[in-house]
């Protein structure tokens, strides 16, 4: 248990993950914050949308871009409960997200600190500031309990 309360955006991302779990999706949630205000929230929805790209990060980036009327999300923060995969990390770079906060590492599928390490490549034209670990215990417990219940 953390000595400090989680920042509100990570609480919101965890809430989105719980909504996804209730819908039968893998419990991963994400929010986009602009000027201290959550402007978009989403959870994984590949099953519901019959879309393998419907990761929480992809959906929330689309929502935020629509809300701002701009495909560039300069000055925005993305808060997500799990380390983004290569696809999502690429979308984060293309959207020009300024800061990425993720709760739990993903040694198998993550592509920020693990695997492809997308932001470390010369071909990556934008690199957000990256912060990890806030909310790790809660996000990891959600995922662990979800998969345990399905085995």
Model regions and ranges:
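Short beta-strand scaffold segments in enzyme catalytic cores
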Residues: 28-36
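Short beta->alpha transition motifs characteristic of CBS
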Residues: 39-46
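Immediate flanking context of iron-sulfur cluster ligation sites
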Residues: 70-82
């Amino acid at each position: 248990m953390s000595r400090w309360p989680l920042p509100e955006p990570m609480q919101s991302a965890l809430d989105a993950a719980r909504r996804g779990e209730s819908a039968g999706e893998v419990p991963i949630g994400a929010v986009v914050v602009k000027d201290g205000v959550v402007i978009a929230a989403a959870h994984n929805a590949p099953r519901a949308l019959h879309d393998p790209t419907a990761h929480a990060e992809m959906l929330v980036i689309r929502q935020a871009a629509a809300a701002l009327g701009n495909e560039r999300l300069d000055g925005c923060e993305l808060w997500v409960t799990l380390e983004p995969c290569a696809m999502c990390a690429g979308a984060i770079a293309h959207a020009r997200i300024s800061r990425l906060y993720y709760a739990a590492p993903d040694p198998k599928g993550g592509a920020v600190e693990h695997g492809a390490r997308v932001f470390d490549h010369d071909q990556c034209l934008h690199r957000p500031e990256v912060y990890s670990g806030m909310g790790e215990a809660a996000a990891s417990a959600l995922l662990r309990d979800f998969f345990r219940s399905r085995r």
